[in-house]
Amino acid sequence: MEALFLRVGWISLTCSAVLVPLLVGKGWLRRHVRAKALYVVWLILALRLVVQVDLSLPEPAVTVEAPSYQVALPARTPSANLPAGAQIEEPSAVVGQTAPEAASAVRTIPVTALLSALWLFGVLAAALVQGGGYLLARRRLLRDARPDLEAEAQAGQTAASLGLKRAVPVRRSRQVRTPMVLGLIRPVLLLPEGQAVDEVVLYHELTHLKRLDLAYKALLVAACWLHWFNPLVWWMSRAASENLELCCDDDVAAGRDAAFRRKYGELLLSTA
C-alpha cells in the first residue's frame, strides 16, 4: 500500500508540472488550439494519472556505490584484579543496536504508513460520495420515467445513421430539464416530459455515445478519486469535460448544411 501511495504521489506531482501551464492558459489554448487536440492532451494526462505504471528505467544510467565501513573493536584482556571465574561483558558488535526493552517500550509508525491510510480513506470516501450519489440520482431519474416509443423509433433511425449498432432506449422523465444520456454500460436517453423530439437533440446525445464520451468522463472521475488531494486534477476534469462538449458539437455540425447548423446553434444558445 505504501509503494502504491508513493507512486500515486509522484505521478500526481509530475503531472501537476504539466497541468499548471495548461490550466492557467486554458483560455488562450481554447482560442488557438483545436478542441480535438486538447481532447488528446487531456486523455493522455488522465491515463497517466489513472494507470499506475512505473516509467522509470529498469537500471539507473549512473550508479554511485556508497563506501562500506567496518568498525573493529579492540579485544579486552582480563584484568589481574578481577576475581577468578568473573566474566567480562563484551560490547555489542553491531553498532547502533538498541536494547530489546527500549524497542518494545516505544512503538513507532512510519509517516508513510499514516499518509497511505489517509490517502486510501480519501479514495474510498470520494468513490462513496460520487459513486453513491450517481446511483441514487440514476434511481431517482428512472423511477418515474416512462417509455416513449415514438421518440425511440426516431432515435433508432438517428443511431443507424451514426453507425451505432445498438438501439438506445428512450424514456420521458419529469425529473430532467434537458436531454441527457444516463449510464455507461446500459445507456438510456432521458427526455424532459412534454418536450418535442428534435433531430439535433438526438444527434447531439447519440454522438456522445458514438464517441465513447461516457467512458472518457469515467476516466476523469477515476483520476479525481485517485488524486483527490490534488485540486489541479479536479480542475483538469472540469476543463476536459467542457472541451468534450466542444468536440461533440464539432462532430455533430461537421458536414451539415446551413439550416442544420443554424438550428443546432439555436439549440446550444437555448441550453447555455
What do the predicted segments below correspond to?
Residues 32, 36, 128-149, 233-240:
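Transmembrane-cytosolic junction motif
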Residues 55, 145-147, 152-164, 210-211, ...:
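Short helix/loop segments within enzyme catalytic domains
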Residues 132-178:
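Auxiliary, metal-adjacent structural segments of Zn-dependent hydrolase domains
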Residues 175-199:
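Active-site scaffold of zinc-dependent metalloenzymes
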Residues 1-125, 142, 160-167:
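Hydrophobic membrane-embedded segments
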Residues 196, 200-213, 220, 248-249:
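Active-site recognition of the HExxH zinc-binding catalytic motif
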Residues 211-241:
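A Zn2+-metalloprotease active-site environment signal
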